[in-house]
């Protein structure tokens, strides 16, 4: 399971010309599911995302998590993060999980974050989405479980 997290001052996701999810200050999470992932991994990744200290404290050090920074989390499915790019000139997606399996774990991951008190707007699984963001920093990390 792979999460590319970006600290943002705002982010939104649009499907068919309509904004379906948006946040102000917080984390934009692009989530990829791999074939050997499971609910335990999704729960652990949700804990890491919620607890990851990437927001500045009063001393300008990355010492606050998203809740402490009074931010929110926008989650967008992104199977391309699981691509095999080790050779050739075209990515292979055989390393990404099948859609039905991925959707279940994607929804489970979102539920785990909501259970932690976040609103968690989302993109639409497997849809053609337009994602807009203002990256704050920029601050971007890849978390892998």
Curated annotation (Swiss-Prot):
A Gly-cisPro motif from one monomer fits into the active site of the other monomer to allow specific chiral rejection of L-amino acids. It comes from Colwellia psychrerythraea (strain 34H / ATCC BAA-681). Belongs to the DTD family. One of its GO terms (molecular function) is tRNA binding. Its EC number is 3.1.1.96. An aminoacyl-tRNA editing enzyme that deacylates mischarged D-aminoacyl-tRNAs. Also deacylates mischarged glycyl-tRNA(Ala), protecting cells against glycine mischarging by AlaRS. Acts via tRNA-based rather than protein-based catalysis; rejects L-amino acids rather than detecting D-amino acids in the active site. By recycling D-aminoacyl-tRNA to D-amino acids and free tRNA molecules, this enzyme counteracts the toxicity associated with the formation of D-aminoacyl-tRNA entities in vivo and helps enforce protein L-homochirality. The lineage of its organism: Bacteria, Pseudomonadati, Pseudomonadota, Gammaproteobacteria, Alteromonadales. InterPro entries: Daa-tRNA_deacyls_DTD, DTD-like_sf. A motif (Gly-cisPro motif, important for rejection of L-amino acids) lies at residues 137-138. GO terms for biological process: D-amino acid catabolic process. Keywords: Cytoplasm, Hydrolase, RNA-binding, tRNA-binding. It catalyses: glycyl-tRNA(Ala) + H2O = tRNA(Ala) + glycine + H(+); a D-aminoacyl-tRNA + H2O = a tRNA + a D-alpha-amino acid + H(+). This is D-aminoacyl-tRNA deacylase. The keyword Oxidoreductase does not apply. It is an enzyme of class 3 (hydrolase). The keyword tRNA-binding applies. Its main location: cytoplasm. Pfam families: Tyr_Deacylase. GO terms for cellular component: cytoplasm. Homodimer. It comes from the Bacteria. HAMAP family: Deacylase_Dtd. It is found in: Cytoplasm.
């Amino acid at each position: 399971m792979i999460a590319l997290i970006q600290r943002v001052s705002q982010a939104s996701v649009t499907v068919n010309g309509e904004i379906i999810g948006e946040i102000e200050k917080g984390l934009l999470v692009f989530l990829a599911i791999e074939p050997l992932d499971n609910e335990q991994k999704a729960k652990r990744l949700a804990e890491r995302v919620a607890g990851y200290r990437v927001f500045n404290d009063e001393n300008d050090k990355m010492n606050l998590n998203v809740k402490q920074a009074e931010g929110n989390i926008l989650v967008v499915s992104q199977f391309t993060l699981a691509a095999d790019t080790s050779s050739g000139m075209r990515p292979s997606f055989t390393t990404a999980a099948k859609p039905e399996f991925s959707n279940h774990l994607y929804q489970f991951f979102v539920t785990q974050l909501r259970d932690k008190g976040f609103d968690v707007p989302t993109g639409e699984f497997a849809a053609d989405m337009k994602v807009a963001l203002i990256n704050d920093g920029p601050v971007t990390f890849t978390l892998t479980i």
